[in-house]
Amino acid sequence: MREGSIDTTGSLDRTLAAITRGALYVTVAAMPFSIAVTQTALAVAVLAWLSRMAVQRRLLLQRTSLELAFVLYVAAELVALVFSVNVPNAVVYLKRLLLIATVYVVGSNVESERTLQRLMATFLLAMSLYSLWGVGSFVVNPSVRVRHIQNSMTAGGLTMMATVVAAAVACEQKETRVRLLALAAAIANGVCLFLTNTRGSWLGLAVALVVMASLVDWRLVVVVPVLAILAYLAVPGEYKARVSHFFDPHYRTNAYRITWWKTGWRIFKDHPVTGVGDIDTGAIYRKYMGPEETQAVGHFHNNFVHIAVTLGALGLAAFTFLMVRILLLLVAARRAARSPALREVTLAGLCGFVAFLVNGLFEWNYGDAEVATLLWWLVGMVVAAVVLTRRSLAVGAMVVEVPG
């Protein structure tokens, strides 16, 4: 290859790499404000990344321990599509599979600890601004729960995970100024989360913080229930009522969920292997709803119940396997991380995933595009941390082998 051609190729590759990184910053900055901007920026990042592969004529893809799980899950989606009761609708919902690319575009293009930290800072700044807006909207109109675009569940899921991320940074960060800023972000997002009045997200945060405390310092575990008790004593009566009925099966929203899950079980029994397809379940729900029900639901407010109904036993097995593989990856990454930057990212990823799983027992948060995008972004950040850990270990081995 001629020298001029090499220079041109190198310049193009650097430009595409810069576009990829810039698009990733836009992705996280837009995450709490606009799913359209978020996914457009993500698409730009993916296209620029693929273009780099074409220019370099090699695969710029970081392998993970998740490939088999992803393949099985995608296969379950496609099998369910073939046997769906509403194939056109199932085709539309295949778009959720595209979000998985987030794991690889982030994991393969974040090439330094500084970039990891800057992406985390960008995310927390955006989420803190969003949370301050949410608190302000509540002050103006306290009769309305804080909402994100159209529902409080999305706001709850986003602020729940942002609070976890901020708390992780505060726990692992060595610089006092940054630690205080992270703590402020955790408080802002935590207050906004509380004002969404979404109990499933509250519980997800509480469990995640207990896990985080146990990983950082077991003595901190007692802090979480103490904070919860103090918060309970300080809140107005209507919030106390919702907390006190957390596990009351007769409480209105709890009773609704139990009814929805029972109806989901009836649908599953008639479609046990491949489910009804990844669709809006409103139409088929009407055929199975009991005489006491007045409204059909388009999803089942539980990730595993919804997957069982829509993808059947095959899909439920594949989805559960994927969740387990992700958890194992996050645990291994946390154990391997050495530097403060890598430890805060892996702690945020692991505890954020725990919060997502717990919240997903009460909401279809995997089907929420905003929350799912955030989930895959966090997993991608941990993949990048794993890559950086391997590189640092390799460099360390070289230093040991080469005499000084």
Stretches with model-predicted labels:
Residues 136, 191, 195, 213-254, ...:
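A membrane-periplasm/extracellular boundary helix in multi-pass inner-membrane enzymes
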Residues 45, 74-79, 101-105, 114-142, ...:
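Alpha-helical transmembrane segments of multi-pass inner-membrane proteins
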Residues 43, 312-323:
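Hydrophobic alpha-helical transmembrane segments
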Residues 33-41, 92-95, 148-162, 200, ...:
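Membrane-interface micro-motifs in multi-pass membrane enzymes
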Residues 27-37, 308-311, 344-384:
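Membrane helix-loop boundary segments at the extracytoplasmic
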Residues 1-92, 101-102, 108-121, 169-179, ...:
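Transmembrane signal-anchor hairpin modules in multi-pass inner-membrane enzymes, especially those
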Residues 247-262, 270, 274-311:
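Long extracytoplasmic/lumenal interhelical loops at the membrane interface
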Residues 23-25, 139-148, 294-305:
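Juxtamembrane membrane-water interface segments that cap and precede transmembrane helices
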